[in-house]
Amino acid sequence: MAEEQAAAQEQQPAFGIEKVYVKDLSLEIPHAPQIFIQREAPQVSIELSNATAQLEEGIYEVVVTVTVTSKIADKTVFLVEVAQAGIFQIRNVPQENIDIILGVTCPNIIFPYARETISDVVTRAGFPPVLLNPVNFEALYAQQKQEQAKANGATTH
């Protein structure tokens, strides 16, 4: 009886966060200290990407990379990039669900850490904090799947 329960538990879907960490972090202020006396409001641009890798059976790494560039005219005020990563355990889940978990659920867990890291680094560098809006990773995932389907459709003709 106990063996049957143990076997049934082993077949239950499992999801867990093993670790969340900063994989890479960089800050550049190429025009310091002169840039600190500029009075113009900077233009801020944000780039976002994510990547996944299977580390071993049932263990995955997901990395969300956020790059924030602040410019006044053609001069870079600062550039900060963080690669926020997480290691996740995903077991006994169908592959199509694993893809959604890795592309939506895991980035949703990791992104707030990246947002906090960027705000903290920018503030420590002497600038007002950059407050990143939440990201709809579900919409990004759907868009990525549509683009892949179009690319696959274009190459099969």
Swiss-Prot record:
Q: Where are the transmembrane segments?
A: none
Q: Where in the cell is it found?
A: Cytoplasm
| The entry's keywords | Chaperone, Cytoplasm, Protein transport, Translocation, Transport
Entry's Gene Ontology cellular component terms: cytoplasm
Q: Which InterPro entries match?
A: SecB, SecB-like_sf
Q: Which GO terms describe its molecular function?
A: unfolded protein binding
Q: According to the lineage, what is the superkingdom?
A: Bacteria
What the entry lists under SUPFAM superfamilies is as follows:
SecB-like
Q: Which Pfam families match?
A: SecB (PF02556)
| Gene Ontology terms: biological process | protein folding; protein tetramerization; protein transport
Record's subunit section: Homotetramer, a dimer of dimers. One homotetramer interacts with 1 SecA dimer.
NCBIfam families to which the protein is assigned, alphabetical: PRK05751.1-3 (NF004392), PRK05751.1-4 (NF004393), PRK05751.1-5 (NF004394), secB (TIGR00809)
Concerning HAMAP family, the annotation shows: SecB
UniProt similarity note: Belongs to the SecB family.
What PANTHER family does its record include?
PROTEIN-EXPORT PROTEIN SECB, PTHR36918
For this entry, the protein name equals Protein-export protein SecB
